[in-house]
């Protein structure tokens, strides 16, 4: 099987990001974004997706966490895109219902080569600690655009904002973990009748 580990840097005037992603890992992680809550979400994502992720981000957190969160999503999406290449042999689709106490989230993914984000998630508070809840959507929009991929989040239940967002990131880990798996019976095929995924 081809090596699906990618290292990349993404530097702007707002953030400097260095990351290594291994799609065929075991769920190990070392994450430092300067935002404790975002670190926690990325660690959950890596653990439940069985991705190995080493990521550091130095961002303009003195402003807020918006640029850091969005740019980490963009960079992580770019890493997925490079690691997947022409998508040959992957399952392509993945979905997962994730219960987190009273919260229940569905995440469904299609590595279609087309960007769509459906964010049907409703939180009752604007912040978790010092993290702006609206930044979570920006993270997933950045990732979906960069892969590019179709990503749906649908909330069926939930009151606690931390639980809701945790279910989103864990569920996405499971869904993406399933989508990137190699289908051994069709490992030389691109999973599309078009012959390519764009």
Q: PLM ranges: what are they?
A:
Residues 1-198:
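N-terminal intrinsically disordered, cationic/polar leader segments
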